[in-house]
């Protein structure tokens, strides 16, 4: 259980934020309920709220875990954009796929030969851009303290 005041996710247990938990159970809860969430409930939430809609099962086995972790941490649209950009890094400009955040047949086909390290590198670039390139974190210097953990996470999977 973590509840870092600088973490925009708020109270989190088993990687599930309070907002995601509340959406899953259909009611507002207190932090104590998040703290007491069991692992089985977290697994059920991951499966229903993230795995099923992500279409991760249609991607190559090599990138599934990293992609799924990105879906959990960046939302599906953000994760798909990172995936699409990683795919485009291997393609000629006249053969790029749209970086639109939608995981359709073109993205799934383009990811066919993607290596996990290629996706991890693109993801780490995403984090650096978030913190250091005038993004939504520009006025949130408190987020800088998370960059090392985010980058480590990129390459753990």
Give the positions of each predicted feature:
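Cell-wall polysaccharide-cleaving catalytic domain and substrate-binding groove, primarily
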Residues: 1-157
């Amino acid at each position: 259980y973590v509840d870092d005041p600088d973490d925009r996710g708020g109270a989190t247990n088993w990687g599930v934020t309070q907002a995601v938990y509340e959406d899953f159970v259909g009611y507002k809860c207190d932090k104590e309920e998040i703290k007491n969430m069991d692992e089985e409930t977290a697994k059920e939430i991951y499966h229903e709220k993230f795995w099923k809609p992500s279409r991760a099962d249609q991607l190559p086995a090599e990138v599934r875990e990293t992609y799924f972790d990105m879906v959990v941490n960046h939302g599906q649209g953000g994760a798909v954009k990172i995936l699409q950009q990683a795919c485009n890094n291997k393609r000629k400009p006249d053969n790029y796929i749209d970086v639109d955040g939608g995981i359709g047949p073109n993205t799934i086909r383009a990811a066919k030969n993607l290596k996990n390290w290629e996706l991890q590198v693109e993801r780490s670039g995403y984090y650096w851009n978030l913190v250091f390139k005038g993004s939504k974190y520009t006025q949130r210097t408190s987020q800088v303290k998370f960059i090392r953990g985010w980058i480590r996470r990129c390459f753990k999977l």
